[in-house]
């Protein structure tokens, strides 16, 4: 039997609203293969095909009023859930470095207050 892939995830909190298309553009501008990028505009989801798939999904539908208040207090306006196979951690770190350089933001946990916050190296 094949080994089960270990999935990892975190939340990417942004200080301004950006679409999945804008996130993808930063990567393709940096040389990421456009054939490995798929965008579902209607649900604001980005799939990056590496050895496994990295999903970057708008988390807005999952936010409660309290979450929105917490985000506002942190100076953040948008949240994406990022899910990826553990073996893609190096690639995800590189992707996050590009996005953080372009959009800033924080890397959070799926908890009530989004803490603990993570560094790119901890992914």
Please place each PLM-identified region on the residue numbering.
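Short, intrinsically disordered low-complexity segments
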Residues: 16-87
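Acidic, proline/glycine-rich low-complexity IDRs
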Residues: 1-9, 14, 18-35, 83, ...
């Amino acid at each position: 039997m094949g080994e089960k892939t270990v999935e990892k995830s975190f939340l990417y909190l942004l200080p301004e609203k950006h679409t999945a298309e804008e996130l993808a553009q930063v990567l393709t501008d940096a040389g990421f293969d456009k054939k490995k990028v798929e965008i579902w505009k209607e649900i604001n989801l980005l799939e990056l095909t590496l050895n496994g798939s990295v999903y970057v999904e708008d988390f807005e539908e999952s936010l409660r009023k309290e979450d929105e208040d917490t985000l506002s207090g942190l100076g953040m306006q948008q949240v994406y859930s990022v899910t990826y196979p553990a073996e893609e951690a190096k690639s995800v770190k590189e992707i996050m470095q590009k996005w953080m350089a372009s959009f800033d933001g924080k890397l959070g946990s799926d908890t009530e207050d989004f803490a603990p916050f993570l560094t790119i190296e901890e992914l």
